[in-house]
């Protein structure tokens, strides 16, 4: 079994419901966080095998927020993205799914996290 490493963690500023970030779509915030995570990890986006993001509320702006965010971040369009909706445990499931892909030898580098 492959050893899995979490090489970085990034988050946005803490906002409040209906606050100053209310007009910023979740996929736009996620894109900024993903760009910063990749920068801090010292990797190039083209080595990413998949982006997995969890969310609680699916919006009509980005029905697959993982895919929308990775494209907005400027990552290669060859990278697949999938969205997990498991309510409060969505981001944990996204990280678990990424670990499983690495353990199974299906991926070497995953960007995983959550929104909201």
Where are these regions (language model features)?
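Active-site-proximal alpha-helical scaffold in enzymes
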Residues: 86-116
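Short, conserved beta-strand segments within well-ordered enzyme catalytic domains
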Residues: 50-52, 83, 110
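Active-site nucleophile and cofactor-binding loops and adjacent substrate-binding regions
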Residues: 62, 81-90
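Conserved "HGTGT" condensation-loop signature of ketosynthase/thiolase-family condensing enzymes
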Residues: 1-79, 115-116
């Amino acid at each position: 079994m492959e050893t899995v490493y979490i090489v970085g963690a990034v988050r946005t500023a803490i906002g409040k419901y209906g606050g100053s970030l209310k007009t910023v779509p979740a996929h736009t915030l996620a894109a900024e966080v993903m760009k910063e995570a990749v920068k801090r990890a010292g990797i190039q986006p083209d080595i990413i095998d998949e982006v997995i993001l969890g969310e609680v509320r699916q919006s009509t702006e980005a029905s697959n927020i993982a895919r929308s965010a990775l494209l907005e971040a400027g990552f290669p369009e060859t990278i697949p993205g999938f969205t997990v909706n498991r309510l409060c445990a969505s981001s944990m499931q996204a990280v678990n799914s990424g670990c499983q892909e690495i353990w199974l030898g299906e991926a070497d580098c995953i960007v995983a996290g959550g929104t909201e």
